[in-house]
């Protein structure tokens, strides 16, 4: 396994991050495709044995059971000082006005709840899952800084939002001498490259580690367009995002298939190699519900694309509507939070 620094920090992470969104009790909406604890543990062990030391989850995944399953497995299988555990906060998952978004109260409660579920006394990377329009940026950034100073959080990161909002949050922290974000977790893959316009150049300039979610476009990049799975049939976000863009995306998938066939490798190799050809990318967040998913992703680290193949892959891309970054309206009751909003990575 290869290891790199996470952004401009001294923290070393594996070139792949295991995304634990799919690990959780299936009856806990909104992820009915999730694997229960018994099915999840072998995959976490497989990741550890392959040298993956970076694990990402969130308080919202499967009603918190993702953190419980992930935390328990890591406590029993790994040394705490050898792994990097990341979680996220923003989306409300209880019917209460202060259990979501990014107020000081919500952030403090969220980290305590996450640490309890993980069974740990700190997390390495605490990320805001989305931008909160209802809370002053200063309140959010100072609260995150205070968590670092309290020892509950080692580093902070952010996820899908407009680049200018991310820059504003960073500037607010720098101006006040508070902890700055070291990572950005955007949606980025061969079928959705809108982040190349502003967010990725900003991250490269500022030394922000980019850990993209949905690197396989919810599996679309790994199979023929007509092939479906339980996930594609139940994932509201994927249905909205990719089914509506079939005419734009199918030519890209065809090129992925062609290059994979030429090299006699799985299509996932092409998707991962393309991501890792970008200097701004630190570690794609890989979801795995089968052992072969994980072994394929790991072996992709030894595969690379030629410059001509990268050009060929990118030439078919057409602009997409921006998606995955707009949170629910701040006055939306938590119980009415759209399921599609919390099925993102």
Model-derived segments and their meaning:
Residues 22, 89-91, 129-132, 160-162, ...:
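Active-site-proximal loop/turn and secondary-structure-junction residues that shape catalytic pockets
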Residues 44, 67, 71, 111-115, ...:
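Generic structural signal for well-ordered alpha-helices
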Residues 26-27, 94-194, 198:
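Glycine/proline-rich, positively charged
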Residues 194-231, 266:
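Aromatic-lined glycan-binding groove of carbohydrate-active enzymes
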Residues 1-83, 149:
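N-terminal binding-site loop/beta-alpha segment at the start of enzyme catalytic domains
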Residues 6, 18, 40, 55, ...:
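Conserved, mostly hydrophobic/aromatic
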């Amino acid at each position: 396994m290869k290891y790199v620094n996470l952004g401009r920090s001294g923290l070393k992470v594996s070139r792949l991050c295991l995304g634990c969104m799919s690990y959780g009790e299936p009856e806990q909406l909104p992820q009915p495709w999730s694997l229960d604890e018994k099915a999840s543990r072998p995959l976490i062990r497989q990741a550890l044995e392959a040298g993956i030391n970076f694990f990402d989850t969130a308080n919202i995944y499967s009603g918190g059971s993702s953190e419980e399953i992930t935390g328990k497995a890591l406590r029993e299988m790994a040394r705490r000082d050898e792994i990097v555990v990341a979680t996220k906060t923003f989306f409300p998952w209880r019917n209460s006005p202060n259990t979501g978004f990014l107020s000081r109260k919500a952030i403090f409660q969220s980290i305590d709840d996450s640490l309890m579920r993980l069974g740990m006394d700190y997390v390495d990377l605490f990320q805001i899952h989305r931008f909160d329009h209802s809370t002053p940026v200063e309140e959010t950034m100072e609260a995150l800084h205070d968590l670092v100073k309290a020892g509950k959080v080692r580093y902070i990161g952010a996820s899908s939002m407009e680049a200018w909002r991310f820059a504003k949050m960073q500037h607010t922290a720098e101006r006040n001498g508070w902890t700055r974000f070291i990572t950005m977790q955007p949606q980025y893959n061969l079928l959705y490259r809108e982040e190349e316009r502003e967010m990725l150049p900003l991250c490269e300039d500022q030394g922000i580690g980019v850990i993209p979610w949905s690197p396989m476009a919810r599996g679309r990049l790994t199979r023929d367009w007509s092939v479906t799975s339980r996930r594609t049939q139940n994932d509201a976000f994927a249905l909205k995002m990719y089914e509506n863009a079939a005419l734009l995306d199918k030519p890209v998938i065809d090129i992925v298939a062609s290059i994979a066939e030429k090299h006699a490798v799985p299509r996932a190799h092409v998707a991962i190699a393309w991501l890792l050809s970008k200097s701004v990318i630190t570690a794609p967040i890989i979801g795995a519900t089968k052992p072969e998913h994980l072994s394929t992703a790991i072996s992709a680290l030894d595969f690379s694309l030629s410059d001509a193949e990268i050009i060929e892959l990118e030439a078919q891309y057409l602009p997409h509507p921006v998606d995955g970054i707009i949170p629910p309206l701040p006055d939306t009751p938590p119980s009415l939070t759209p399921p599609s909003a919390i099925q993102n990575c």
